[in-house]
């Protein structure tokens, strides 16, 4: 991804008035000369072209491409990676100038690539709190094969009509040279949109250079090679580009070189450039206008107050629409001069004279340090990140610069609403006006507590929202302050304390609302058997795209606390499971079994915690429904409302759920039930019952393929009760609950197709005689990779252990180690002995987090979608802003080797990765899902992205044991837990909604 700030099509801009671009020297000389083009003087186009070539040859040696990542969301910047440009402004000390939105407000990791393709690490030493510039530093001694040259900053040379070149990493193409002419030097700054970085209180320079992403931070040079401006942004649908003047960057550079503080002053007011005609409408006195025009003959505008921030130094003094006339008794119409005065007046009084309508108003404001209201630290806790509200964001929404901003709403604080833009008001009914108060409040909250949080959206201060969150200090253990260190360029971590232990759950009793028997008939009492389920997953595994899932579960055994839900709600066993009874009581639960082929997840809760709540166990009927059977449908729609209808079974078929591009669990080899009622498409969970209230089928949500927009397609289907009963009986009896399974996936085919493929007529007659209703057989569509291929794709199953197979339930092998099968292969009937396989290790039981990527063994959905496994190290996800993101290690890839050493499994991978030093490159051999080999180089970053090894362990807290590897050979228990990966988490909650 290449980053370049872009203005919206409707961004504010001021007309330049009557100014027109001056003719360039070439045109002027050609006009004056009476000679032919061949006889041009050396000062003509030929000399100009030569001069440009010489200047550009020198400039390109100072320009670098920057490849960087912001590893954490902070202020206006999301976490992510990008490419941009920079240029050397001090070769001796190693300073580079680029944009603030490149240097990033938050943690930055990056390197620069010079013209000769030498690479050097860079780190930020300064990012301006307001303007779009910052400085990176590098070690000049690390550049061995070229002389590093610096460019001179000449803000005085930026004039209308100046021919310029933009030299940089345009479109991430390493080096591009774009030509243009400066057309304006007094335009207002572009507006890049909400909740993103926007410059203010300066003028911008405009030219039509048609730059694109990646050119941010490029030098804008004139023909002698002097830098006259800094490329900052551009229009999305035009060739227009916007440049930052260099007056303030030049001052900051001098301060860095002299090792003096870069003071920045503010009165917390935004000014805009307004033309004289606009100022006249606001009340500008004609005598004052004449005075200004006389002093500044080329002036076309003055400064007008646009925004005054509440509780700031100028609050209740300046007002919107005030025209600035004097500052400290000096007429001032230039934003750069205003900034210069404020920067030199931090802590001092500044006297302003403004025209307000027909009145002249003189007022005094004390200039405040802008650095004091630009956050340089954040707190990470419960998987989310918090910092004091910044001047940048407060200015955009005219808010006082106070409050706690949630820069990364994740983990426990993944709140309902938009993805970003939350201001936290209170926790546990205690106000949190600033970050220090927030820390003290969080210290007193035990792990797993459910606490009230008050918050509002930054764009809507009138609507205060109260919600309840569950504090997670067991998966996401980190509670630390992260502070910017401009000496090292890193952000330093400081532990803020261990979590208080969770308080034990206490029994509670509630009543269950009764349904009207007249309206709901035989299903009225089934409401007593349902509980709601909330599953929170701190890591994305097995191709899952969500952090939270909501659904319902049917209680099967109230004495043992056993219930069943779908694997669309509980896809894997790493997370926190909570059930809600009668919308009143919430208690913890745990996953006890995930069925390897059916869409069933069995969960367990402590019945004692429900006290005398009249929860009931559903009665399941050991009966397979048939087409045409009358049933009662009882379900929960997308709003969790109960609906019911009397209907009938329309079909019972062997369903094949389409697979998604990123493999994830899907039910295979099962018979699905559909019903006539339209309610079935609106409900993601429920049951089908007979007229006696016995459950004959569960109603479940299945995830299938994805649409072209990337949204999940959901299928709502019924599953017969006998399938559930077989697992329930195992759980109740205490025997091994994991069934044996076949290593293949089937699909149903008609006998006519089998006949065409060579099945003898006598066998078809026998099948028709035995099957009765179903004239079908089953064809192998996938064989699980990594298992013996006794059966192959395209085989047709004729019989198993002497019985014709026309229904999928005839192939149940729960307790069978081997099956004698008669198959049709390549037109010939054959007999084979097919082994079954235990499903004990079907689920993910080890996870390695490295480079910000989540690695695991290929889960069963992967093995059923691929022919052969390149390795047993599978990338299931990656975090934004991580080394994996920056160096293009993508999801659904396999890691086959590390530094040339084959890594067949996670054990091999961890062994090799522990040998590698921090900040060094590692050569990673990978294979795509389609077996295309790719070799990557990834830089280790153990400061922000340590390697963490998670192994399922029943004796450990949460059922998982975690080990963190920092230095080579060093092993310790992780104090930070791990960071939730939100890259593909495209919704706060995933509910069992309408079928798509």
From Swiss-Prot:
CDD domains found in the cross-reference section: cpPDZ1_ScNma111-like, PDZ2-4_Nma111p-like
UniProt entry keywords in alphabetical sequence: Repeat
Annotated ranges, domain PDZ: 280-358, 745-827, 860-930
Record's keyword annotation contains Repeat: yes
Region (Disordered), start-end ranges: 1-35, 972-996
Single Gene Ontology MF annotation: serine-type endopeptidase activity
Highest taxon, organism lineage: Eukaryota
GO BP of this protein: lipid metabolic process; proteolysis
A GO CC annotation given for this chain: nucleus
Keyword Repeat in record: yes
Coiled-coil ranges from the UniProt annotation: none
Pfam families (UniProt xref): PDZ_1 (PF12812), Trypsin_2 (PF13365)
Acidic residues: bias regions: 980-996
Family annotation (PANTHER family): PRO-APOPTOTIC SERINE PROTEASE NMA111
Family recorded in the similarity comment: Belongs to the peptidase S1C family.
Identification of the protein by name: PDZ domain-containing protein C23G3.12c
Organism: Schizosaccharomyces pombe (strain 972 / ATCC 24843)
